[in-house]
Amino acid sequence: MQFFRRSMLQVMVSGALCSALPSIAFAQTQKLAPEYDVIVIGSGFAGLAAAISAAENGAKVVVLEKMQVAGGNSSRSGGMMAIPGSSVQKEQGIEDSPAKLAADMKRIGLGLGDPEHIKVVTELAAPTFEWTKKQGVVWRTDLTGKGGHSARRCLITEEGTGQGILIPFMKKLKELGVPVVTGMKVIRLDQNKEGRVIGVTALEDYKFGKEDSGKPVEIKAKDGVILAFGGFSADVGYRTRLDPKLTGNLK
């Protein structure tokens, strides 16, 4: 179960397809405490899932989001998730397995995908799907096989958008007493003399696009900091290591 909780972030990041939708209107201005057990940076699927799991396991948690609203790119997601061997597939008599999805990912990804990450995404997709339902996410039961999928294994939220995941997750965090603080741009991971991360320095009241905005504040983390932010697609060097076709000429 511990491995499942750690790896759930990767599954939530990898499970959705993107479409252009307006950003979800979740703005929170709760007062920060000087210290938490866990600090989560980023309020998309991965960050909110991590925050829920940590809070359910007894941690005092805060989620920091640099934008004025929560949700990140997940708010623009199509709310779709590939789930091999799901309970919905079994009910409809569709044979599928994590191994089949892994083979599809390796084939479409030209063998460039990290084997361990593929293993996490494929083997934990079904339990993660069941976990989202416990958090209040409602999924349609009509299955589809998008793109390179060799089986009908993709499910979409009842709303047909990523908000079908974000809204229940935000409600759950409210129930758990976890603040999601917007307008907080993390600019540094703070470390002790041994190099252990013990907190963050962030710009409070940061306004996206106005780099001179915000006041630096330090927030301590007793147990750790979870990095659940995106944006790697803007890093040409990193993305070309993942796929040589994604050069700086790609617009």
Regions found by a protein language model. Give the residues of each.
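Boundary at the C-terminal end of the N-terminal hydrophobic targeting segment
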Residues: 25-27
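N-terminal Rossmann-fold NAD(P) dinucleotide-binding loop
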Residues: 47
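Glycine-rich loop(s) and the adjacent beta-strand/alpha-helix scaffold that form part
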Residues: 207-214, 220-251
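Conserved beta-strand-loop-beta-strand element in the redox core of flavoprotein oxidoreductases
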Residues: 191-218
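Aromatic pocket-lining residues of Rossmann-like dinucleotide-binding sites
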Residues: 54
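Beta1/beta-strand and adjacent pyrophosphate-binding region of the FAD-binding site
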Residues: 32-44
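Conserved N-terminal/central alpha/beta ligand/cofactor-binding core
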Residues: 60, 66-179, 183-188, 195-196, ...
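N-terminal secretory signal peptides and thylakoid transit peptides that target proteins
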Residues: 1-15
